[in-house]
Each structure stands twice: as C-alpha cells, then as structure tokens.
Amino acid sequence: DAEGALYENVAQTEPTDPAGGTLWVDGKVLKRWDGTSSMWISVPTVYTKISCTDIGKSFSEGDGVTLAGIAYTGDSETVKAEYAALNASKVIQKKGDNWIVVVGLVSRNAAQTGGLTVKREAPEMDYICQAQNRLWGCRYGVKDGKAVNEVYGCKLGDFKNWTCYAGLSTDSWAAQVGSDGAWTGAVNYQGYPTFFKENVLHRISVSGAGAHRVTDTPCRGVQKGSWRSLCVVNEVLYYKGRTEICAYDGSVPVAVSAELGDERYSEAVAGGYGRKYYISMKNSSGAYELLVYDAARGLWHKEDNAQAIMFAAADDDLFYIDAATNRLVAANGTQGTREGDVEWSVVSGIMGYEYPDHKYLSRFDLRLQMRGEANLYLQYDSSGQWHYAGRLLWKKGTTRSFAMPVIPRRCDHVQLKLSGKGEMRLFSIARILELGSDM
C-alpha cells in the first residue's frame, strides 16, 4: 500500500469462497472482497515497494523520478509486462533509506541483482528565469534523436523536480511551442516567465490551478548572443534586438535607439540603475562601447569603450566587470577611487532658418552650468568640416550666460558642437542672425 506495507496472500485467480478483505489480481486490477456488499471492489491505487541499500537516501517523498532497468526473470509474460511497466517516470509516495514506494502493480514479488537505476533529472535548458516560486526554462535542439522545442516549469517551490506529475496544481509542467528558431533569452517580466527568439516572444500565464498557458507574439525579439541585455528599468523591459534596442511594456516592443544611427551592434550586456539603462556592445568594427540610455529624458550618452562582462546592482550602485582588467567597476563611483574629470562632447541637430534670405550668424548665446572648459565648433550646410568658433572657461560651477561671437558666414543651415572636460549642463541656445540678400 502507500505506506509500503505488503499485501499478503494475493490470489492470482478468482477465489470461489472469498472472505472479507480477500485480495485477487484480475488482469491489471487489484480487487478486494467486500463482505458487506458481497462483491469485488477495485482498489483505486496500487503501489509497489522497491527495496535496495541506500536507494531512498538521496530522495524525498513527492520527488519525480525515472526508473530504469527493472526486469522479471521468471516465465510469466504477464508478470514480465508488469515489471517492465515500472520503467517510467514515477512519483515517490513513501520512502526510507533503503526503500521507496511508487504507483504500480506487480502480482508477484521478485529479486534482481544490479541493473536498477533511479534518477531525478532536470531537462537540458538554454535559458532559465524565476517567477511565481518556480524556475522556468526553455530548450531548442535535439534530444534522443528527436527535435525539442519546449518550455518547462519546475514543481512549485522545488527547483529539483522537473518531472513530478501527480495530478496536482503544484506539479511540474512542460509544453511544446510551434515557433521556429533557437531561443535567445528569458526573463521574469511583470510576473510572467517570458522567453524570446529573434522574431517572437512567448509569455507564460501562470495559473494557481496548474493550467498554465503559453501565448506568442511575433515581434522583434532578443538578438542571438545578447541575452544579458535583458533588463527592467522603471518597470519597462529593455533589450538588444537584431538591429535596434527595444523597450517592451507588455504590449509590443518599440525601438528606442534611432539616435545611435545605422551602426550594427552585437554581444550586448546590460544593467539598470535608477532611470538609466547601461549597455555594453560590440560595434561593426569589433570595438566595444558602453552606452547609457536615460529613460526619463530619452537621451543616449556614450560613457567610454569599456567591455562589460556582466552587470549587477547592489548597495545603491551599479557594478560591472571590466573585461580588459577583470576589475569590478562602480558605475556611480560609490566605491573605489573616483575617476577624474572626463572629456565630453555634444552635437546639435541641423538648425535651419525661417527666413527665405541667406542668413549668417553673428553670435550664439549659451546658458549653461559649467565647472571646467569647453570649445565651440560650427559646421555649415552639412559640409562635414567643423570650424573652431571659440572657447569657454568657467570654474565656479554656477549657471550663467555666455555670448559667443562668430565670424559671419552665410548658410542654409548649421550644426553646433560643444566639447570639453569637466562638469557641464546646457540649458538653452539662442542664435543671433543677420539677414542678407538672396544672392
């Protein structure tokens, strides 16, 4: 029975004059004679006890295991089939150090020497995330000669059990998916285990009753090799797609990297702190860049050329491992030696003019807060050549206006570039124009 007690005196043929409690194996069903109703009653669940030295030491009751190597060496083909049926996935009902009990019917006891294996296995998985007190994973490939394209969930609260199927809401779970291609990443987003391929995402709706459901959304997914770019910043999920960086809020992903131009990046690794998304990527020339996206302002900044192996947020800072030095770097400088003033540059968009006449600039009025120095450059009519236009120097770190006169030059449009070293915050730019003729 379920406690491991042996059923005694089980008849192989129907007794002619049974007493109450008499047992009889009718084919594959164990029956008990009910003296009150004078009829045979099927025993709903029959158990088999397997005894072997230390067989139960490594397991717990409720574990899902796979049995193999069980065989009956007698002459009865019926009993051989009963023993062979035990070679399957089972749930341990009871256990001791030297025995386990599983669901199964054998009509005769037998002993064998060697060959028996009991395994508790986790499936091979490409990516894993945690959600709703379970681990969830995915796998695309070939297993035992068969194509595999599946998602998995472990038993509730038990990461060791992935094949425990007892008909309960806490059981392990697995499902096949129909989308093509390899998995490229996984993340817990808004409580949903979310799995990505390059052109689709699959989201699992976790059910308290165990009836979990998979939905798929054809969209820009995670680029192959950029699974570490998945990161939540201000409740929005950011990641590196094949051609752009995407933001996903639970509906459909949108691109946020138009300002980075047509450069193709790969092997992205990212982390988040506050409202900022830090991402280290390899560009098309093979060099790495560390870029920062300010989600609140929609601005991109290039920090430096660091290659980050991975990011982790802790102690009110964001840390990453620098691949060049294998050192831990605090992005916000709360630990270690703070770096000195950094060089910076900012380039405006194309600034056109509202008047039909050819115009020329007489000066720029810049309102900024600065502690350091900056140089001003101008580019006329998208010529590709930057012309030096002046230098700013202000060490106090307060806000003030600077009038920057420029040599008059007629043009259709102009771009401005500021570069310098130290602290700088730009509030406004005013252009002072002089009008000329159409000639």
Protein language model regions, located:
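Tryptophan-centered short beta-strand motifs
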Residues: 1, 38-40, 47, 211-216, ...
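Small/polar beta-strand repeat architecture
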Residues: 2-4, 22, 38-123
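Extracellular/surface-exposed low-complexity repeats and stalk/linker segments enriched in Gly/Pro
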Residues: 2-30, 36-45, 260-268
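Short beta-strand segments and strand-loop junctions that repeat across beta-rich extracellular domains
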Residues: 7, 29-36, 143-167, 290-298, ...
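Residue-level recognition of conserved beta-strand edge/terminus positions
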Residues: 27, 68-69, 138
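Short proline/glycine-enriched turn/loop motifs at strand-loop junctions of beta-rich domains
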Residues: 56-60, 198, 369-374
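Beta-propeller and closely related beta-pinwheel folds
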Residues: 121-272, 301-304
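Beta-sheet repeat architectures centered on beta-propellers
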Residues: 221-236, 242-439
